[in-house]
């Protein structure tokens, strides 16, 4: 069963550059983490045509947005589905009250700060420029984050290598606020989309991924037409016959997943055997639960990797898991492509140890 799950999830995640366009890849996996270089590398893995300028172009064309979504992390999502994703995962304003109090913002101060921030974000503005414009506001960025959770402010990426952001008022960028969508209907839609991209999966997987309580996750999945293939693993009914006939993966396929890739973050702890053997989970995930950058061989995690830049040289360290052999020539070309995307003039790979 594990091999079938691995092959199926690899296909449904569109790994191996399975689709032509990054917009299609993004729709098929629902969302990718907004952080850079996670977002561009996640799209590079899944689309045949992706280069350094493509993500910026998608943002300027308003094809994608960066919004608080699953588990209140910031995700890059298709603009067309953003209202439903936002509505399904949005926290009520009272849930942010503690954060505002911690920043010294009562209701009146927050309302005043919102107005000031909106005045300064009619055009994209960097965080540093915003701080200069409102120098007396020590609580500024906390207020901006809560405004994003209200759908009033959006983030824009500026660099593929690092998470350098600009902020812009949603209404100024889109000419309107995000459409209001029904939260429950949106959650039911999200549950069905999740199973199509990440199934077969358990109720606890969807609850963990989405950040909603288990009872709400269960109720949302209860509205979907699914089959239980065993062990509580749910699959859309119309995918069952194709799932049962899926072919094993080529054992020599190679994929480089970035930190927080959609696939590594798609299932709860205890449900990740299709991606990584139980004995290696501690090498594939940080204690906090963050999915680490991984080298996949035949859809199975065999090493962790990290990188840093020295000028324009990209220095890569690959750390194979215990009792896993990964010849350098197996992944060298894949890292060259990552370096090309991130503007490296040279890529140097070294072996690491746990």
Residue locations for each model-derived region?
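Long, low-complexity intrinsically disordered regions
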Residues: 1-264, 268-272, 276-354
């Amino acid at each position: 069963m594990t091999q079938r799950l691995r092959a199926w999830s690899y296909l449904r995640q569109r790994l191996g550059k399975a689709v032509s366009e990054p917009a299609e890849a993004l729709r098929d996996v629902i969302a990718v983490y907004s952080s850079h270089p996670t977002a561009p590398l996640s799209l590079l893995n899944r689309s045949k045509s992706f280069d350094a300028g493509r993500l910026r172009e998608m943002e300027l064309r308003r094809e994608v947005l960066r919004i608080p979504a699953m588990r209140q992390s910031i995700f890059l999502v298709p603009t067309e589905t953003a209202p439903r994703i936002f509505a399904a995962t949005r926290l009520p304003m009272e849930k942010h009250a503690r954060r505002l109090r911690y920043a010294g913002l009562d209701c009146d101060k927050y309302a005043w700060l919102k107005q000031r921030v909106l005045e300064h974000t009619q055009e994209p503005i960097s965080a540093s420029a915003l701080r200069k414009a409102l120098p007396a506001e020590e609580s500024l960025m906390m207020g901006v984050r809560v405004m994003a959770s209200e759908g009033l402010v959006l983030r824009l990426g500026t660099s593929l290598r690092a998470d350098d952001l600009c902020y812009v008022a949603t209404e100024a960028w889109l000419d309107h606020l995000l459409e209001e969508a029904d939260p429950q209907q949106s959650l039911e839609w999200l549950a069905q989309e999740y199973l199509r991209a990440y199934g077969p999966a358990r109720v606890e997987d969807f609850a963990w991924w989405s950040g909603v309580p288990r009872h709400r996750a269960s109720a949302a999945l209860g509205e979907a037409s699914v089959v239980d293939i065993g062990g509580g693993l749910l699959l859309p009914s119309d995918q069952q016959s194709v799932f049962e006939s899926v072919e094993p993966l080529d054992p020599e396929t190679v994929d480089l997943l970035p930190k927080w890739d959609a696939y590594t973050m798609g299932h709860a702890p205890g449900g990740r055997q299709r991606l990584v053997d139980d004995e290696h989970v501690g090498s594939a995930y940080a204690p906090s639960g963050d999915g680490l950058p991984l080298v996949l061989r035949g859809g199975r995690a065999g090493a962790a990797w990290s990188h840093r830049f020295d000028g324009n040289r990209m220095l890569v360290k690959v750390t194979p898991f215990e009792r896993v052999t990964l010849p350098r020539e197996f992944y060298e070309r894949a890292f060259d492509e990552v370096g090309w995307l991130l503007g490296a003039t040279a890529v140097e790979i070294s072996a690491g140890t746990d």
